[in-house]
A protein has these predicted regions:
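Non-catalytic C-terminal accessory region of glycerolipid acyltransferases
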Residues: 2, 97-220
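Helix-to-loop junction immediately C-terminal to a conserved catalytic motif
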Residues: 3, 9-40
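A secondary-structure boundary/capping signal
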Residues: 24, 39, 61-62, 84, ...
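A generic structural signal for well-ordered alpha-helical segments
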Residues: 13-15, 79-80, 106, 138
Length: 220
């Protein structure tokens, strides 16, 4: 209910200010578990995707966003909670598995979960190699993966910027990729191939230059 109320305020406001171009919304299933796998250019990405979809979307967010003090901390905590963000401690030794477990719980319950296979934001604009957690989730929960291409969000709030700016944004949703097509492969190969196909679909949507390597640079 809170998410719907926030959407009713933020969607008209964001559309009036940023006038985003949204393509392929029909590719997002209206019901049932689904993963939305996107490129990652900006802090604002986790707001752009939920505001462009026809249904609520959960994301992971640094636990720091939920622990701030004062009016600013309370506002940020309320906003992230209302947008369906799930706090995760990135410094925890078990952070990666906890993140996957949180996502698995959402999609097995029939929800939509947003994930960034690159692992962190791209500083140079290239599309980095995807990590196989997205494929593990899809195969484990037997849910489709909808590739998402974000264009222009890096101009709204680049890495290191504290305040958003006005810029054109495009959100593209590609056709769902279903895990059934990969089950004939050995588990490791299935995860790698599915992940590579998801990243190729994202690249086709964004036109980014493939980096060919993992993104090992922290964007914090």
């Amino acid at each position: 209910m809170v998410f719907r109320a926030v959407r009713q305020v933020l969607i008209p406001l964001s559309h009036a200010v940023y006038r985003p171009t949204i393509e392929g919304r029909e590719n997002v299933p209206r019901t049932g578990g689904v993963l939305l796998a996107s490129n990652h250019r900006s802090f604002i990405d986790s707001f752009a995707i939920p505001l462009a979809t026809p249904r609520p979307v959960n994301f992971l967010a640094k636990s720091d966003y939920f622990t701030g003090s004062g009016l600013g901390g309370a506002f940020r905590r309320s906003l992230f909670t209302a947008m369906g963000a799930i706090p995760v401690d990135r410094n925890s030794a078990s952070a990666a598995q906890e993140s996957l477990d949180a996502a698995l719980e959402v999609i097995k319950a029939g929800g939509a979960f947003g994930i960034y296979p690159e692992g962190t934001r791209s500083r140079d604009g290239r599309l980095y190699r995807g990590r196989t957690g997205v494929a593990w989730l899809a195969l484990e929960a037997d849910v489709p993966v909808v590739p998402v291409g974000l264009i222009g969000t890096q101009n709204i709030q680049p890495v290191g910027a504290s305040m958003p700016r006005i810029a054109e944004v495009t959100v593209k949703f590609g056709r769902p990729i279903h895990p059934e097509a990969y089950r004939h492969l050995p588990a490791g190969k299935a995860r790698r191939q599915l992940t590579d196909d998801v990243m190729a679909a994202i690249q086709a949507l964004t036109g980014q230059e493939p980096a060919g390597v993992y993104n090992e640079v922290s964007s914090r």
